[in-house]
UniProtKB/Swiss-Prot annotation:
GO BP annotation list: 'de novo' CTP biosynthetic process; UDP biosynthetic process
Main location: cytoplasm
Lineage start: Bacteria, Bacillati, Cyanobacteriota, Cyanophyceae, Synechococcales
Keywords assigned: ATP-binding, Cytoplasm, Kinase, Nucleotide-binding, Pyrimidine biosynthesis, Transferase
Gene for this chain: pyrH
Positions with a binding annotation for ATP: 9-12, 52, 56, 159, 165, 168
Subunit note: Homohexamer.
Activity control note: Inhibited by UTP.
EC number(s) recorded for this UniProt protein: 2.7.4.22
GO annotations of cellular component type: cytoplasm
Protein name stated in the entry: Uridylate kinase
One term of GO molecular function: UMP kinase activity
Amino acid sequence: MTYSRALIKLSGEALMGDKPYGIDPEIVQSIAKDVSKVVENGTQIAIVVGGGNIFRGLKGSAAGMDRATADYVGMLATVMNAITLQDGLERAGVPTRVQSAIDMQQIAEPYIRRRAIRHLEKGRVVVFGGGCGNPFFTTDTTAALRAAEINAEVVFKATKVDGVYDRDPKKFTDAVKYDNLTFQDVLANEIGVMDSTAIALCKDNKIPIVVFNIFQPGNIAKAISGEPIGSRISNSS
């Protein structure tokens, strides 16, 4: 099965590659190249990008900032990443639009659901920045929300690891990878794939989540084509 419309949740950390912070241009171009291939094959792609490579609201809050203020700074960071990703995609030959939940007319369209869907239908990639426009919500929740709004068939969570494990595979060599999980498993066992709000949104709207390693070239195409890759979370195991 090849998905016809998919949403990719791309963490800010993925964009920084091996750097301690910021953006690695080579990573951006690699991701753009992989996305261009699936767009050429007819799949409609939307992307929600995080901002943790620049600023993370929870860390700012822990350091003494007002939580809402810290979250707004984090939302601005996601727009910076979205514009950078747009540049990379367009240099790879992919027409791309950035839509921001926070109004920034000079650099991004406002988020308008029907316009976003129309862009997708025309073969453009839509990158959503600004989170969902409200503090206290993660970009994972934004990904689940936007996926439901644009009728995406699947959410791909593109990360630095090749799936979901019972514990941190970087710390424990005997960590076990899950090939399939149910949403109920994730919620009941508090498995840290996404926050519970994002998981519940996908569960209620019957949108499966596939977690895979973005740094393996060709993985986006494999995921889009329905190949068994990473870990799949759905309503049935």
